Each structure stands twice: as structure tokens, then as C-alpha cells.
Curated annotation (Swiss-Prot):
Binding site for NAD(+): 7-12, 33, 96-98, 120-123
HAMAP family named among the record's database cross-references: DapB
Similarity comment text for this entry: Belongs to the DapB family.
Organism: Cupriavidus pinatubonensis (strain JMP 134 / LMG 1197) (Cupriavidus necator (strain JMP 134))
A Pfam family it matches: DapB_C
Active site, renumbered: 153 (proton donor/acceptor), 157 (proton donor)
UniProt name for this protein: 4-hydroxy-tetrahydrodipicolinate reductase
BP GO annotations: diaminopimelate biosynthetic process; lysine biosynthetic process via diaminopimelate
Known role: Catalyzes the conversion of 4-hydroxy-tetrahydrodipicolinate (HTPA) to tetrahydrodipicolinate.
Annotated metabolic or biological route of this protein: Amino-acid biosynthesis; L-lysine biosynthesis via DAP pathway; (S)-tetrahydrodipicolinate from L-aspartate: step 4/4
Amino acid sequence: MNIAIAGASGRMGRMLIEHILATEGVSLSGALDLPGSPALGQDAGLLLGRQTGVAITADLEAGLAGADCLIDFTRPEGTLAHLAVAKRLGVKMVIGTTGFDDAGKAALAEAAKSIGIVFAANMSVGVNATFKLLEVAAKLLSTGYDIEIIEAHHRFKVDAPSGTALKMGEVVAEALGRDLKTCAVYAREGHTGERDPNSIGFATVRGGDIVGDHTVMFAGIGERIEISHKSSSRQSYADGAVRAARFLADKPNGLFDMQDVLGLK
């Protein structure tokens, strides 16, 4: 399978390229970056200390030529621009970008009628196993427990709460028969009054080089259950993304997530 990478000079892009080069059955066919990036024209493996024969380009059509799938961990506006070209060229997509609004998500769903797309807030196998644990816990602890979600990421992350934290909230809310849009509390300040027992709270930490920590707390009277996932590197995201790309090999179209990829549905 031929795979192109968006954001090729970024932290996640470099990790994806390294993982593809080390994985049998897949090859790097294209590397995309923003216009004006100092990496344009360089070999995609330069920062990894090796040659790939693939030059980083801002030309979407050139970067996607010969690609079966594009892996994209960029920003919503960039991903949507890539999506339009990928759809036209028939290139499938694995999307790990977070921060989409409802219109952006609708655009992904529409494009998935024509091409196969895996869209997931987190590609880690461990995180997706955590989602299943949360579903079970929420059903067992449906009454008498207050639910709070705490997430921490590096200082460079631009959206909050994280897409993974929001997905955790959606999993818990769905298991409880609630709508996260109406029960989520994203900030508390001043005299807030007593906690609404049906609410799901979020707390966000940003600092340093934290790759990604997530904890869901079920706080009852006399006990507290915490389900946590902590990432120590982006390797697990890269592994999951390449796994998702291979999953799409025989999928002509459709919108999938990592639960589909891992057979957890």
C-alpha cells in the first residue's frame, strides 16, 4: 500500500514516516507540507537521517500522485483542503486531526460516500481499549457517581478539551443515555452552586512536552474509580494510523473509526 503523509515535517509527520519506513507491506509515496515551509524540496527522511527518495511538497496533486491513502494529523482547515483533493483523486484518508466543528464533520461524512475514511480522535490501540472500559464502567456506575474527565497535553496543542477527552465524554454520555452537548461542563469559576449530578465535567492542563494523559473519574460517596491512559510517545498513534490505512485497503468508501479497525464494535 502506498501512503502519503500530510504535515510531513511536524512531530507526528516525522513519526509516521519513520513508522512507514520500518513496516513491511507499506511504502511512502508522498509527503505534504504547508506552502512556505522550510522543509519543502527536502527528502522526507532528512530529519530521520536517511533518504526516502520522496521530496516534501506543497502541491497536493503531486504529493498524492500514486497514493492509495493519505494520513493526516494536521489542523481542521488543512485537513478539509486535503480532503477535497483526495476525494477528487480517489485517495482514501486516515484522519487524526481534532477540533472539527459540526460543518467540518459533515464534510467528512459527505466525502466518505465516495472514498474510505477512518476518522478517530485517537489512533492508539490502548486508548480505544480504554473507550470500551469506559462504556462498561459507565453502565455499572450509572447512579451515585459524579463523572469528571481530566486531560493534559504539551504546551503547543491548540484545541481544548482534546479530541480524545471529548470522545471519552461521548462514550460515557451515550452509555448513560445522555447528550454530551447538554450535560458537559467545560469550565468552573466563582460561586457555581452544587454540582449537577447529571453533568460530565472537563478539566484541561497544558504544559511542557506532555504527549497525552487522560483520566476519567467516577467519584462516589466513600470510593472513587479512575480509568486512565497515559501516552509516553507518539509511536502508538503512528502504529494505529498505519493499521487504519491497511484496514481501508478493501474499503471503497465509508466512514469508520478505530473501533471498526480493531473489531471492537
